[in-house]
Amino acid sequence: MKKIVYTLLMVLMFSGCANVETYNLKYADSGKTLKLALGDTVNVELPENPTTGYSWAFFTNPEPQNIITNITESYRQYNVAENMVGVGGIKIFSFKATHPGKVTVTGYYYRPWENMTESYVSKVVYNIVVKKPLTHQGE
C-alpha cells in the first residue's frame, strides 16, 4: 500500500513540473515549422498600419481550429513623436496549443472590404506541430 501511495505522489509531483513554453514568430519566420507541446503559446508579431485600411487576418488548415486556439490579439504602436498620425506598429496574435496534430496557419495582410485572395499585399505561413503528451508504457 505504501508503494502505491508513494508512486501516486511521485506522479502528481512530476506531472505539475511540465514546462509551458512561449515562442515568438516574426514576419521573417514565414515558412518555418514550429513544434509545440500542449499548453505552449506562440506569439506572432507582424508589422501593421491600421491607418492604411490594411490588417492581418489568420486562417488555419485544416479547419476547425482545435489544434491551436487564438487567445489574444493586441497592437503596439511604434515609438514616435507625440501627435504623429499614420504611424504603424506591431500586431501581436497569441495562439495556444490545445490538441495534438498538425496545422498550417496562414496570415493575409489585406483590406477586409476587398477580396482577400486578389487584394492581399503580404502573406505569412507557419506550420505548427503540437506533440502528443508522453504516456507510460502499456497505456
Short names for language-model regions:
Residues 2-7:
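Sec-dependent signal peptide recognition
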Residues 95-105:
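Glycine-centered tight-turn and secondary-structure capping sites
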Residues 19-43, 49:
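N-terminal edge beta-strand
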Residues 52, 60-79:
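Short, solvent-exposed loop/linker segments at beta-strand-coil boundaries, enriched for Pro/Gly
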Residues 21-28, 114-139:
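Extracytoplasmic/periplasmic copper-protein system
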Residues 85-92:
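Aromatic sugar-binding surface patches on proteins
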Residues 108-112:
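Beta-strand-rich extracellular modules
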